[in-house]
Amino acid sequence: MRSLLVAAALLVAPITAFAESAPHEFLDDAKALLVIGACADGTPPEKVKAELVTKHCEKVKAAQEDYKKSWLSVAKPWFEAHVPKTVPKTVVYPFAGGDLSTALTVYPDADEITTLSLEPAGDPRAWSKLDNKQMKTALAVVEKEISSLYRSNFSVTMNMIGAMRGGQLPTQLIFSLTALKIHGYEPTSMRYFKLTKDGDITYLTDDDLAKIDKIKNVAAKNRALSNVEIKFKKSGGKEQTYRHVMANLDDDHIKKDPSALAHLDKKGTVAGMTKAASYLLTFGVFEKMRKYVIGHVEWMVSDSTGLPPKVGEPAGFEYETWGTYTASNMAAGGPVTPQWKELYKAQPKRELAFRFGYPDKKLNGHLIIMKKKK
């Protein structure tokens, strides 16, 4: 009898250990934030005052509709016509801020989209811990940033620092959920994760959350909940995966913490994009990311903050210019302005009816396709 009990205990122990270490599922929080922050159809949770959500959503829905009519309705068919069906289904978007929506516009059929930025996804449970006064203030921040993103088509860096790193609500996450709402997707799973130094994913468990919940500082807690994975689909469609990774992608930070770049390396050949990226990809201190783009990207779309021609062409890329470019819109782009001007001058004029990322110095929209030569 004793041997049977020991055997039974040995069988139960692994099951118990597995249950304790199972990833925590945040889908209910995702659905709550879809209604509260992203203004999807539905009834807010009982804890949240419905009038606050109604007032918040009046402005947010107006911004979303304006975005769909003025930008998405023009940009979406353009990308459908110009993105080859053969591009990799794995997408990497560095310096993305909270911009999942553009990634879904360019690559709607992607199996996996990964964005990287300095901003954390943030605590998805925060909504349940705010009183009405705190919720009103937090929703005002979210509304301001969503309106700015969708009416400017890029986020202002200083705004993101406050709204996404220290926000009472997880603004970066709400941006992502708003993108799903606009494009007609429903989340099917939401988990948070950490990366090992080798770039592997380790999902957060209830034990991890118990430790995180001891953190009182909002910004610090948001940093502890920095990386999110959302699975989503359309009715009758395939399940797709979105991951956001908080990472500083300059060389010094990658040397100290190689996990993000190691994670990207594991993806193999990818499709890429970047825009409104403060020209970071052109800076000397981002050499590792330039090498990553050169070594892994097959097809990429950007504004003038992408990989400059004098770097891309020797590496085997060819470029196709769209819209009008006269000069970069900020001093940081000054060093690469001559390269882009020369490239635009050498190519035929191709009209572009929408803005993609930064405008040029004269507020012209421009877009660049970069692809590996066959």
Regions found by a protein language model. Give the residues of each.
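Short aromatic loop motif centered on NTY/YTY
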Residues: 189-242
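Positively charged n-region of N-terminal signal peptides that target proteins for export
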Residues: 1-4
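Short, thiol/selenol-centered motifs that function as redox-active sites or metal-ligating centers
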Residues: 96-107, 153-177
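Conserved segment of the thioredoxin-like fold in thiol-based oxidoreductases
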Residues: 140, 146-148, 169-180
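Thiol-based oxidoreductase modules, predominantly thioredoxin-like and allied folds used
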Residues: 113-164, 188-212
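Non-globular targeting/processing and membrane-anchoring segments
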Residues: 20-150, 219-224, 231-374
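Short, surface-exposed basic-aromatic patches at helix termini and helix-loop junctions that form
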Residues: 84, 174-186, 234
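N-terminal signal peptide c-region/cleavage motif recognized by signal peptidases
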Residues: 13-17
